[in-house]
């Protein structure tokens, strides 16, 4: 596959090359996937500049992979690869996900709305600082971004084909204290009304 800047526009960051492993050109590759063995099935991988990397041999080691790339035949060549990020294009990914699984690249750019259908903004990114996935949203009103937990409580509905996802503002922490108190008071009032019946 020939490098094309246009084709790599929709790239997906899958792994990063780490330390050399042995003296014959193998490297440890940290894979950002639950199934590191799939890395080879994607075919050609690319770096930030579009240089292609072809996997000749891949062995899984814990949640990472020991990889031998075509043309990398000694430790010195392997050392030169340390820190290179590896990407595939979105169309190289296999679409065999479960109903509640998504590729992050498919969610970026989706419209974000609350449970009443009011537009809040757009998904602009994902982060994980160790405590779980966070969804970055560029808000319409504040022209700023916020991070919310990417959980079923905060994001109860995702509809990729229709181009939107639903965010529950209370669970997502998007309300200020005044708005939060109003919602809590409304909930308490509703509960009181039900108790009277």
Swiss-Prot record:
Keyword annotations for this protein, in alphabetical order, are: Chaperone, Cytoplasm, Ribosome biogenesis, rRNA processing
* Record carries keyword Magnesium: no
**Record bears the keyword ATP-binding:** no
Cellular location of this protein? Cytoplasm
Task: Please provide the Gene Ontology terms (biological process) for this protein.
Answer: ribosomal small subunit biogenesis; rRNA processing
Q: Which Gene3D superfamilies match?
A: PRC-barrel domain, RimM
List the Gene Ontology MF annotations in alphabetical order. ribosome binding
| Gene Ontology terms: cellular component | cytoplasm; ribosome
Against InterPro entries, the record matches this protein to:
PRC-brl_dom, PRC_barrel-like_sf, RimM, RimM_N, RimM_N_sf, Transl_B-barrel_sf
* Residues of the PRC barrel domain: 99-174
Record note on quaternary structure: Binds ribosomal protein uS19.
- What family is this protein classified in? Belongs to the RimM family.
Q: What is known of its domains?
A: The PRC barrel domain binds ribosomal protein uS19.
Function description: An accessory protein needed during the final step in the assembly of 30S ribosomal subunit, possibly for assembly of the head region. Essential for efficient processing of 16S rRNA. May be needed both before and after RbfA during the maturation of 16S rRNA. It has affinity for free ribosomal 30S subunits but not for 70S ribosomes.
PANTHER family per the UniProt record, alphabetical: RIBOSOME MATURATION FACTOR RIMM
Name listed for the protein in its UniProt record? Ribosome maturation factor RimM
Q: Which organism is it from?
A: Bartonella quintana (strain Toulouse)
Its taxonomic placement starts with:
Bacteria, Pseudomonadati, Pseudomonadota, Alphaproteobacteria, Hyphomicrobiales
